[in-house]
Amino acid sequence: MDSRTGEPITARQAMNGEYIWRVPNPLYFKIIKHHKRPFNYNHDIIQVRIQFNHNLRRALAIHKCFLDFTVFTRLQPATWRFLRVFKTQVMKYLDSLGVISINNVIRSVDHVLYNVLDSTFDVIEDHDIKFNFY
């Protein structure tokens, strides 16, 4: 849903893409929180944010795009190592597709968390997307 207007994102907006080789460094990756074994649970909670950079947002007619993923995993990775592996694998998957769009980024995250990394048992996705009016 577009957080500015409250209207649902159309399939055309979600699939609108740009060739990955035309946009240098298209995504920013950040770890927002990393809870290590909270409340003596047997899993870690890692919150990752993916931001679209300026050139990609301009190509896709997006004002703002933050994709937040809360990952519940039984792994006990160091924060920097998880971010490095996650970023590398997401970019490798997007390179193999050749086109970067909102749907392809979400599809690549799903592939990395469930097929590449072991012991991921739940992911909660949240987003803040605003499209340009003009």
Swiss-Prot record:
Domain of life: Viruses
Gene Ontology BP terms: viral process
Protein name (record): Replication enhancer protein
Alphabetically ordered keywords of this record: Host-virus interaction
Protein role: Increases viral DNA accumulation. Enhances infectivity and symptom expression.
Known partners and oligomeric status: Homooligomer. Interacts with the replication-associated protein (REP). Interacts with host proliferating cell nuclear antigen (PCNA). Interacts with host retinoblastoma-related protein 1 (RBR1), and may thereby deregulate the host cell cycle. Oligomerization and interaction with PCNA are necessary for optimal replication enhancement.
Assigned protein family: Belongs to the geminiviridae replication enhancer protein family.
